[in-house]
Amino acid sequence: RLSDKRLLIDAEGPGAFDGIALDTQGRIWCGFGGGGQPGVDPALLDGVRVYSPQGQPLAHIHLPERCANLCFGGAKGNRLFMASSHSLYAVYVNARGSVR
């Protein structure tokens, strides 16, 4: 049962969130994309957005297409896998995925 709900990240505006992953520091890694909205340049939106545990934007990994899902993997848990409609991208990051 959830309680004390609050807005952490506002997705209002152009673009939309998709898959989400968390790292061991509590940062939120979100797949993001333009969603084909008129007048929106997808090159500015497509990729992965990283937020602090308090919801502050920290980084944007740009991809040539919308990131539909993502997860951490690799031997040390510091490789970010990003899936889109046509491609799978992977990059080593200075973070480790949270253990489930």
Q: For each of these PLM feature ranges, what is it?
A:
Residues R1, Y92-R100:
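Short loop/turn segments immediately following beta-strands, especially the blade-tip
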Residues R1-E12, V48-L63:
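Blade-edge beta-strand/turn elements of extracellular beta-propeller
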Residues R6, A11-F32, P64-R79, S85:
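Beta-rich, blade/repeat-based domains predominating
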Residues G35-P38, S87-Y89:
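Short glycine/acidic-enriched loop and turn motifs that connect beta-strands
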Residues Q37-L45:
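Short, solvent-exposed loop/turn segments at conserved positions within beta-propeller repeat blades
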Residues A43, A83-S84:
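Structural signature of WD-repeat beta-propellers
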Residues D46-R49, S87:
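A short loop-to-beta-strand structural motif that recurs across blades of beta-propeller domains
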Residues V50-Y51, V91-V93:
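Hydrophobic/aromatic beta-strand positions that recur at structurally equivalent sites within the blades
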